[in-house]
Amino acid sequence: MIYLIVAFILLLLCLRYDLFERTKGRKECYLIVLVALILIAGLRWRVGGDTTRYLYSFYYDTPLLKDLTADDLQIGNKPLWRILLSFVYTIGGKFFWVQIIESAFVNILIFKYIKKHCQYIFTCVFFYYISLYILFNTEVMKAAFGIVVCLFANDYMLDRKWLKAYLLIVIGVLFHPQVIVFAFTPLFLSLRINKISILLLLLSYFVGYAIQISVGDYLDLLESMGDDAVGDKLASYGSNPSYIEERTLKWQIINSFPIIIYSIVCVYLLKNRLSDKLLRLQPFFIMGLAYQIMSLKVYVFYRIADSYKIYILIFLAYTIVTITKDSRLLHKQVALFRTFLLFSPLVLSLLFNTMVRNRVKYYPYTSVFKREIIRKRELHVHNEPMIEYSCANKNQY
C-alpha cells in the first residue's frame, strides 16, 4: 500500500507543479518527497531480492576496519563499499544503517541531478520512482553509489573539465567496476538527436546481435571454469529462468519496446522545442537508448542501460508534460485523459517490469520497526540462484 500512496501523491504533485505550474510550496514538497523515499528504502526490512545477500555479507563477510587487507581493497572487491561496511560494522551498527546511508546518498544526488537538468521535476521523480528507485535502493546498492557519482562526471565532461570528470569516475569505479563504461563517454559527446542517431540506434540492435553470437562461446568457457567467481555468476545469468524469459519476444514487447519506442518518437517529434538544458544531454540520452536496444539481444547490457536510464526519464518527463500543455485548447480533463491514453502503455510497462512482475520481493513492505517475516518472500529469495542468504534473524538485523 505504501508504494501506491507515494505514487498517487507524486501524480498529484505532477499535476499541481508541473502541469498547472503552481509555485507555492514547490521546494518544500520536493524535499518532503526526497525524505520519504530515503526513509522507505533506508528503514525497510528484508525487502528486495538482493537485500538479504547484502545482509549476509555484512554480518558474515565484513571485517573490522583494522582487519581490512590489501585483497579487500582491490578494485574487483569494490573497496569503497567494503570500507563503508567495515566502518558501520566496527562502530557496532546494524545493516539498516548501511541502507539509510546508501539511500540518502543515492536519492539526494538523483534529486539534485533531476532538479539541475529537468524543468518538470515531479514528473521526472515519478518516472524514477516507478522504474529505478527500487532497483537502485534494494538490488544494486553498490553500483548505485557509482552510477550517481558518474552522472556528475558526465556534466564535467560536457564542460570539458576532464580532471574532475575522471576523478569522479575513479571514485565510482571504487564502488563498482561496472561504471567504468562512463570513461568512454567522450567518444560519444558529438551525438545529436537527428536522422544519423536514429540510424545508430537501429545499428545498435545488430551490434547487440553480433555480440550475443560472439560472446555465447565465451560464457560457455566461463561456465566450465568452476572456481572462477565471474564465470559462475555470468553462467548463472545465462541459466536463470527469469533472464531466459527476458530474451523472449513477449517479454521484450512488455518490458523494453515501450520505453524505446516512446523515447524515440516523442523526442524526435519535439526535438526543435527542447530546452537548452536538455540539448546538452542529447549524447547521454542516445547512449541510454542504444544500450537499452543492445540489451534486447545481450541481456547483461541491462546493467549499463540502467546506468543511463535517468537521461531517458528526463527527456520523457519533458515531452509528456509538453504534449499535455499543448492541449490547452481542450478542456483540462479532456487533455489529461488524452495524455493518459497516450502514455499509459509506457507507465504500465515500467510498473510491470519493476514493481508488479517481481512484487513478491517488495510487497508487502516491512520495516525495521515491525520486522515481519513474509514466508512467500523468504521462499522466493532463498530459491534464487547465485545468492547466499542469511537466516531471518530479527535480533541480528
For every predicted segment, state its role.
Residues C150-K164:
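Membrane-interface transmembrane helices that cradle and orient dolichyl/undecaprenyl
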Residues T52-P63, D71-G93:
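Short hydrophobic/aromatic helix or loop-helix immediately within or flanking a transmembrane segment
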Residues T138-C150, N154, F175, I264-T324:
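Membrane-water interface signatures at transmembrane helix termini and the short loops
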Residues Y133, K164-F188, L289-I293:
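Membrane-interface alpha helices of multi-pass inner-membrane proteins
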Residues F284, F337-Y397:
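Transmembrane helical bundles and short interhelical boundary loops of multi-pass, membrane-embedded
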Residues V47, T52-Y56, L64-L68, P186, ...:
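Alpha-helical transmembrane segments and terminal signal-anchor/GPI-anchor hydrophobic tails
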Residues K24-G25, F111-S131:
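Transmembrane-helix signature of polytopic, membrane-embedded enzymes
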Residues P79, I91-I108:
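Loop-to-helix entry region of an early transmembrane alpha helix in multi-pass inner-membrane enzymes
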